[in-house]
């Protein structure tokens, strides 16, 4: 299930189902709320503001994301799945890119639009591989948790790097590790490994492989069994891993206020 609550009290919510459930959308919704009582309690007093609907497929992808005098934002161009909530961050990254394009003139250059188009294609593939791996692993929580670590390492490394080492052109760095020599190929490789992780030994090796694969960008100490999946904000871990960010210990410590928006 996905659930997005807005400030004015309206919530966008829905279920993603592997197989079609018989009945009208209203009947399916009520059935799922009964099946999951905790969710049912949360939505017990909710009323729909529009008719409930069923869509056989939510994924889409167009042939191009940009052309002469036009460009699409990511979700107009392609959508994969709500899992990992990539939408807002990806859209903001694209808006930043387009804003940079307009800094050089009234209309973005053909070269900039081609670059924008190529990045959105590559990033759609990246999201697709990451989500496909997560669905493949979903029946085994330990495998799913390991797959999720790939996502969390990607976003935490990028967020920390952009705050501690800001760059005017950071928007052109690929979303979710696209173009990163350390992480760029990890989602596709993880999907391939998950498809062949049939035995317990294979599954243990996959978890170990993820830990090794994300290590060069793991600034937050993720994939640590001792935490039992609970990761508080731990600046000491970040400071110890200053080299991962290409910073000295002293320079990282002095830059820490930037993590909360300080100067």
Please provide the spans of the model-predicted regions:
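Active-site substrate-recognition segment that forms the wall
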Residues: 1-20, 65, 74
